[in-house]
């Protein structure tokens, strides 16, 4: 085949393929159609094939319902306004149909809606990316201005605004998600809508996610729901009433357990007002809420300014069905893992006749109201919420409801009457678990204990006499977050009023004398007001590990948390075996200028880890502990442990010792055993030890010197096992005794220009040598010398020697000196005397001869003769050889 024929074949094939695509309607992009009337719009929709963009060329009067049939995928744009002219549905999206709303404005023109109807009825897919839906005025019941209904119906809102609509009947919503539908809100706003709630009106909310005839869901990751007014505020999750639910769900077993679910991950729900429950979100009956993010702020309601939760278990129907069965139908469950609930208010927003709770005449639960046994707060922040009566941050309604909170910090809250951090009514209970419970501190009742405000009581906790002591108790662990101790003290007293007021007693620390650390309060049923004292280090640790923060909230009672039901912080165990120990400080009687306060830290380690600390010599060999006392071995292990940088021990408290507490502190109700998986390990007891902090912020080791103020102090520790099995600790501080030696050089007979002297300690040189010379008057002073080393049993021996001196003598240049040392006197002075040795005498010259010289002459003559004879003999011998 020629190349030309081959190319022609390829082109023909390509044309055939493209023709086939066109024949079957395959398109590379959506078709665009422009229309100028509602009739043209509907015709364009009906004629569309595949994705179609319809541009509205001008504003239009909606004289008929626009229908999106199954199989149609339409995008509307053009930025124009569509105005309703009747109460009919404006847009009807059938199951299988899809409408994307780009930038169209839908003006409701104050027109009504029909019974059980909508303005936009969506049983398919509706995506709102922009535009507006506004100015609808509905007086009919069971209406959703934007209704998404059915298991295959989906509403997605990425932008746009649904705002300023009005509704005045029951079971209504601006946005209704029902019968198994789904709503994804990623952006845009639903704002400033009004739903009447007086007279026969009510049972409505701006957004409704209904658990009716199927489980509906909403996921919110962005956008804003704000400024709406209704009986249930911003979002209702669940159902409006138990009767309404049973009528709709119990006729079909498939719908028995229908729920409405909100997954809140982002966005803002703000400044909404509810007449009854949940200014921001109402989780009612069949509702479920999971909050992993987002902000709920500035909302108002009598029950739960931010969030209100009700399961109706205490209703007549709830009692008739029984708890287990009822909770299957009406879980009203909430799980909060993260997010911010702030600035909400529990206050009266409706007539009192609509409020059935006698304790709510001024609003309860500024941040959250709990009337359910399925509420878990694992994380998140409740800040700056207020309640007119009880529970500024959170309020638990009654028995049998229970709120479960994990790793909670309650701080900086205020009650004008009692219980700045938490208040429990006569039926209220609270428990804090040992290892993952809660820390309370720096809350305030009235003007606080620090100002002795006797008109209030209980800066941190107040609890009223219990109606049923067998089941209603207060259990507060003194083991706070990150295992730092919380010291509980009585802080004023409470009168006999049902909800409790201060009886005018003095505040902490003058409520009881002497002050008593209550330790862990286990099963308290009588009225009590409490102040929590936590070290600054313990506060920092709590802030670091807390997952739930309750702070800045206010109410007359229970600024942070109020409860008529139960609050459980953390998981088991609540009860545990305990030990006590006392740390005492001793000063020398002679030391009257020591510091007035000393910081002591308490540390904890398990016995298994403590036993693993090996004592060694400097060369690494095992230390022979024979003859060492139990306390000496104990302290040696502690010192090695702390010097090693190991992480097997942890500080759990820090207190000040001073004259005010007689230089001692008793630590009570400490954990006897290690906790493993929230249970006691009775095979592994805890060991506690104390160390004091010096002025430089260092922990002073045993038998070591440390600075305390202007003094050098030697700290020593003694541990003695007490009856509980812990070790009482005595810290003895002795001022380090110092001495000095002043050395003066004395010369006898002669002197040099300078000499050097060396200080010795116990026979070994100490420091550099010193020069003695005329410039320093031949005197120097060695000062700050320790009389006895830390840990030693004998005093040091100091001496000074002249450098170069040996055996009492020294040669300097050509001169010889004798060196003598005086003893060190009681004033620490000594003298080194150098005495010049006399110059050695020269050998005596021969005595001159005064005789006649005869003897010397004869001697010379004899010598000369002998020499001559020897020469003669020598020569003769050579000749004959």
What are these regions (language model features)?
Residues 1-11:
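Bacterial N-terminal signal peptides that target proteins for export
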């Amino acid at each position: 085949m020629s190349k030309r024929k081959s190319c022609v074949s390829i082109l023909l094939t390509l044309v055939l393929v493209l023709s086939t695509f066109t024949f079957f309607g395959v398109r590379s992009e959506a078709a665009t159609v422009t229309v100028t009337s509602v009739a043209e719009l509907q015709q364009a929709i009906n004629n569309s094939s595949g994705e179609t963009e319809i541009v509205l060329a001008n504003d239009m009067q909606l004289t008929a319902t626009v229908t999106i049939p199954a199989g149609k995928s339409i995008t509307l744009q053009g930025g124009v306004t569509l105005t309703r002219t009747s109460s009919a549905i404006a847009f009807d999206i059938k199951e299988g149909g899809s409408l994307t709303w780009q930038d169209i404005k839908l003006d409701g023109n104050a027109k009504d809606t029909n019974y059980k109807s909508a303005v936009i009825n969506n049983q398919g897919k509706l995506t709102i990316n922009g535009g507006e839906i506004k100015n609808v005025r509905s007086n009919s019941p069971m209406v959703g201005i934007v209704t998404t209904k059915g298991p295959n119906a989906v509403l997605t809102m990425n932008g746009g605004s649904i705002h300023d609509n009005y509704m005045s009947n029951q079971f209504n919503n601006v946005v209704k998600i029902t019968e198994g539908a789904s709503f994804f809100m990623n952006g845009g706003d639903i704002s400033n809508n009004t739903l009447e709630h007086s007279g026969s009106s009510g049972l409505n909310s701006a957004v409704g996610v209904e658990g009716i005839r199927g489980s509906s869901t909403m996921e919110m990751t962005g956008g804003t729901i704000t400024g709406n007014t209704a009986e249930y505020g911003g979002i209702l999750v669940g159902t409006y009433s138990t009767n309404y639910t049973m009528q709709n769900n119990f006729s079909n077993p498939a719908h028995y357990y229908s729920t409405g679910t909100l997954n809140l991950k982002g966005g803002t729900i703000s400044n909404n007002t509810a007449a009854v429950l949940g200014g921001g979100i109402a989780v009612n009956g069949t509702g479920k809420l999971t909050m992993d993010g987002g902000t709920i702020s500035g909302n108002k309601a009598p029950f739960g300014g931010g969030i209100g939760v009700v399961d109706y278990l205490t209703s007549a129907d709830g009692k008739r069905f029984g708890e287990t069965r009822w909770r299957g139908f009406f879980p009203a469950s909430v799980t909060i893992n993260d997010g911010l609930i702030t600035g909400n208010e529990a206050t009266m927003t409706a007539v009192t006749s609509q409020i059935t709770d006698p304790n709510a005449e001024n609003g309860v639960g500024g941040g959250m109201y709990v009337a359910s046994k399925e509420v878990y707060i694992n994380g998140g922040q409740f800040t700056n919420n207020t309640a007119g009566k009880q529970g500024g941050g959170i309020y638990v309604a009654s028995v049998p409801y229970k709120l479960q909170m994990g790793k909670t910090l309650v701080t900086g809250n205020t009650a004008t009457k009692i219980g700045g951090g938490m208040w429990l009514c006569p039926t209220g209970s609270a428990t804090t678990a040992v290892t993952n419970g809660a820390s309370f501190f720096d809350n305030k009742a009235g003007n606080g204990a620090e100002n002795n405000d006797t008109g209030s009581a209980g800066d941190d906790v107040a609890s009223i006499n219990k109606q049923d002591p067998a089941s209603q108790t207060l259990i507060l662990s003194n083991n706070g977050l990150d295992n730092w101790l919380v010291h509980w003290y009585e802080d004023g007293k409470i009168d006999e009023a049902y909800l409790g007021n201060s009886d005018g007693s003095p505040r902490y620390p003058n409520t009881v004398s002497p002050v008593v650390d209550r330790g862990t309060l286990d099963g308290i049923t009588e009225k009590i007001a409490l102040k929590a004292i936590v070290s600054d280090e313990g506060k920092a640790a709590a802030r670091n590990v807390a997952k739930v923060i309750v702070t800045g909230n206010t109410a007359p009672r229970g600024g942070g948390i109020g409860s008529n039901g139960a609050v459980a912080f953390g998981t088991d165990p609540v009860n545990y075996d305990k030990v006590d120990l006392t740390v005492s400080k001793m000063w020398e009687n002679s030391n009257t200028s020591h510091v007035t306060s000393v910081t002591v830290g308490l540390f904890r380690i398990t016995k298994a880890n403590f036993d693993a600390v090996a004592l060694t010599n400097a060369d690494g060999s095992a230390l022979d502990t024979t003859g060492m006392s139990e306390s000496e071995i104990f302290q040696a292990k502690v010192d090695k442990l702390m010097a090693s940088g190991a992480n097997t021990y942890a500080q759990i408290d820090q207190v000040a010792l001073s004259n005010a507490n007689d230089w001692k502190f008793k630590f009570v109700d400490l954990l006897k055993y290690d906790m493993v998986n929230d249970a006691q390990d009775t095979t592994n007891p805890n060991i506690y030890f104390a160390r004091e902090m010096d002025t430089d912020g260092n922990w002073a080791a045993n038998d070591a010197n440390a600075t305390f103020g202007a003094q050098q102090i030697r700290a020593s520790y003694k541990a003695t096992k007490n009856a509980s099995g812990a070790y009482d600790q005595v810290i003895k501080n002795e001022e380090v005794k110092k001495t000095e030696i002043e050395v003066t050089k004395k010369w006898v007979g002669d002197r040099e220009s300078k000499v050097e002297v060396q200080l010795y300690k116990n026979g070994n040189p100490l420091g550099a040598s010193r020069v003695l010379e005329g410039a320093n008057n031949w005197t120097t002073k060695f000062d700050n010398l320790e009389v006895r080393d830390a840990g030693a049993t004998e005093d040091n021996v100091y001496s000074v020697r002249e450098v170069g001196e040996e055996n009492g003598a020294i040669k300097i240049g050509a001169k010889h000196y004798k060196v003598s040392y005086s003893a060190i006197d009681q004033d620490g002075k000594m003298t080194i005397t150098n005495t010049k040795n006399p110059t050695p005498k020269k050998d005596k010259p021969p005595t001159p001869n005064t005789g006649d010289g005869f003897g010397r002459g004869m001697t010379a003559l004899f010598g000369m003769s002998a020499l001559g004879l020897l020469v003669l003999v020598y020569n003769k011998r050579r000749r004959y050889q």
